[in-house]
């Protein structure tokens, strides 16, 4: 009897192991971190693990199934989805199942895994991309969405990333502020419910809150100890980070374009690609997480990131709008004495009918103010060259003051709402860059400066 029972137990264990072996386990690794997905018996993809690298197959085999990797709208889960598609027949639900995955080396030390999922009732394909930077312990993720339905489908939400964590406590750090009062640090515990860091300001997305976050696990963040996940989105428009703690104290982090006013009509066979989400995971505090990002940015993101950076002297704080050629040349002398590489001429050098003596007029009239610069910008570029430093200049050709020659001639070039009064921020309006005439004008401003003054080495824009 005992032998039969032992045989039955062994048989069941072997059957379970063989069954588990049939289901793909997808491991995305850096030197210190593992992000592991597995396919469930129902064919759906689950995030099984995110944490310190696991080097033994037995450790991976004993991991739980986990949470659905890229949660869809309209099915049985009650929590915030990563994707919301309305099909061309009006069905607002999507159910994604695993199809395949690929793995390739992008470059030495950089690997990419692509997981393909499809809805088995609708011809919709979602690809999850993961690019792992080994030494920097940083992972880049983005999503591609396509379909072969007869008509366009509507994308209401399309996250770049969805991560799952299961810890005792979570402490979120965000960075908020305003002009001249940037990056106020606030750390707070996350408890049941949702916390969102987002913006709806479009091109001024970074105005009041920064598009990155810091998440400490189990305890508050410390500089040199503790587990910390830091994330950011490679996107200059509306962004959203949603942190949702559920009834089991499990945390979902959904990152991507803010769904607000961002519905997208996706045509058949068109591929929609989300922005990149970047995250790093440190086991020795937030200081190491910061260094991971710095190392990655210098090597992979910033041009000549590991080279010596140039320094510049900007006249703005020294003169504001009150300057002439003599003042600027004197500042160049000071720059040379300090060993600075470049002099930058900021706001206030342009406009004649309405000279740029303050921020209330002249913007978008890009001719040198003759009272301030009787010899033009060329005099300054030549002076800088003689002193052995480079010359840069400030422009903002997409903005306009109502008190300007350009506005008087082309009021129809500004963005405005019909039947509404104009609203001024810093006494200025935005030109409509969807207008081909405006595009030509803005291009002409930059082209004219570069052609007329080829020694301009830098634009502050």
State what each model feature region is:
Residues 22-36, 44-244, 260:
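Polysaccharide-binding surfaces and accessory modules of carbohydrate-active proteins
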Residues 91-98, 264-283:
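Short Pro-Gly-centered flexible turn/kink motifs
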Residues 279-310, 317:
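Terminal connector regions
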Residues 40, 148, 158-160, 348-350, ...:
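An acidic- and aromatic-residue-enriched active-site/binding cleft used to recognize and process polar
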Residues 133, 266, 371-374:
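Hydrophobic beta-strand core residues of beta-sandwich domains
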Residues 1-23:
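Bacterial Sec-dependent N-terminal signal peptides
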Residues 21-25, 249-267:
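Short acidic, Pro/Gly- and aromatic-enriched capping/linker segments at domain boundaries
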Residues 304-454, 458:
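Aromatic-lined carbohydrate-binding/catalytic grooves of carbohydrate-active enzymes
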């Amino acid at each position: 009897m005992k032998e039969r029972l032992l045989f039955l137990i062994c048989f069941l264990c072997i059957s379970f192991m063989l069954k588990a072996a049939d289901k793909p386990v997808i491991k995305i690794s850096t030197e210190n971190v593992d992000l592991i997905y597995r396919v469930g018996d129902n064919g759906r993809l689950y995030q099984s693990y995110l944490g310190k690298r696991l080097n033994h197959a037995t450790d991976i085999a004993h991991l739980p199934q986990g949470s659905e990797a890229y949660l869809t709208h309209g099915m049985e889960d009650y929590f915030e989805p990563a994707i919301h598609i309305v099909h061309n027949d009006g069905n607002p639900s999507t159910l994604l199942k695993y199809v395949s995955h690929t793995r390739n080396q992008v470059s030495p030390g950089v690997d990419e895994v692509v997981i393909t999922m499809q809805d088995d009732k609708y011809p919709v394909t979602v690809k999850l991309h993961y690019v792992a930077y080994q030494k920097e312990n940083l992972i880049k993720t983005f999503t591609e969405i396509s379909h072969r339905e007869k008509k366009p489908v509507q994308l209401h939400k399309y996250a770049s990333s969805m991560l799952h964590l299961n810890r005792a406590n979570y402490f979120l750090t965000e960075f908020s502020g305003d002009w001249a009062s940037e990056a106020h640090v606030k750390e707070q515990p996350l408890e049941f419910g949702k916390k969102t860091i987002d913006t709806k300001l479009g091109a001024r997305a970074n105005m009041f809150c920064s598009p990155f976050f810091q998440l400490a696990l189990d305890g508050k963040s410390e500089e040199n100890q503790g587990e910390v996940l830091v994330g950011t989105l490679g996107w200059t428009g509306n962004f959203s980070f949603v942190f949702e703690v559920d009834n089991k104290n499990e945390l979902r982090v959904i990152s991507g374009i803010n769904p607000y006013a961002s519905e997208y009509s996706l045509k058949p066979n068109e591929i929609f690609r989300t922005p990149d989400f970047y995250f790093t995971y440190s086991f020795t505090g937030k200081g190491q997480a910061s260094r991971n990002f710095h190392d990655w940015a210098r090597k992979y993101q910033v041009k000549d990131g590991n080279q010596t950076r140039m320094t510049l002297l900007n006249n703005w704080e020294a003169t504001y709008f009150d300057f002439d050629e003599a003042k600027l040349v004197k500042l160049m002398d000071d720059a040379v004495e300090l060993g600075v590489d470049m002099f930058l001429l900021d706001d206030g050098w342009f406009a004649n009918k309405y000279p740029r003596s303050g921020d209330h007029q002249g913007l978008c009239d890009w001719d040198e103010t003759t009272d301030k610069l009787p010899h033009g910008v060329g005099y300054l570029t030549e002076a800088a060259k003689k002193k052995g430093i480079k010359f840069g200049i400030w422009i903002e050709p997409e903005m306009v003051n109502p008190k300007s020659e350009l506005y008087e001639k082309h009021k129809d070039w500004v963005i405005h709402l019909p039947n509404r009064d104009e609203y001024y921020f810093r006494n200025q309006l935005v030109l409509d860059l969807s207008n081909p005439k405006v595009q030509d004008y803005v291009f002409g401003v930059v082209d004219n400066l570069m052609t007329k003054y080829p020694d301009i080495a830098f634009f502050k824009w």
